[in-house]
Amino acid sequence: MTARRVRIVEVGPRDGLQNEPVTVPTDVKVGLIERLLAAGLTSIEVGSFVSPAWVPQMADTPAVMARLPPNPGGRYSVLVPNLRGFEAARAAGAGEVAIFASASEAFSRANINCSIAESLDRFAPVAEAARAAAIPLRGYVSCVLGCPYEGMVMPQAVAEVARRLVALGCHEVSLGDTIGVGTPDQARACIAAVAAVVPVERIALHCHDTQGRALDNIRACLDLGVGVVDAAVAGLGGCPYAPGAPGNVATEAVAAMLDAAGLATGVDPARLAEAGAFVTGALARVRAGADVSAFPG
């Protein structure tokens, strides 16, 4: 009997490294992505085309993409904030572009200075351009299990944003517990609400491990049919709302949990550990101000 397959979307090179207080050299980013690919991870978010003034850590995304090895059967994804970012991503050869919205009005206004409805309207031209260029479009929804400003977020609010993203043309919607406050019961309620308006096959889960419940939340949602999980190698990326606390759940932990549950991921644990060791070692040198040009590549 063939094991049920769960696809891990590796977000470390973008969502993880963009939160670093230092600029990570292009060589390190490329070396990390090469190792992730060798570990069997074929869905990799490699960067973003957001203004360098806002996210300087991602300013070299075009240079990173120009050096990436072929990814047959997989996709290199990038985050885009607007049509200008999309055009840059297309020119760089992105295999997928991602757009983002919030399930919390307060977070939307604090993060991108507009309402949820306005943010979705702004992405309509991006969705149209992606459709015309036959580039797959992914959607992110933040604060699905809690907001740093509003507190509790209702599942129905999450479902409506997810529905709108799919209506725009997103083939997949990733639901993010941005501040890592969710519980398994809350996660199940959220997935159930979204699955009522979006096919569960198009739902991904993006958990942060701020309070140590990410794996429990993922496990609860797997039982409801979720088959796509976002994670970051070595748990890259902290939580901006809880300094010093973990952010993204570690890919190593997710892969081990799925393997123990008898679920197939296609990930080689030893190669994944090598990728984690590579990036943590490189980051330690960068943070210390050391030259990484001779770092093992």
Where are the predicted features?
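Catalytic cores and adjacent flexible loops of soluble metabolic enzymes
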Residues: 1-297
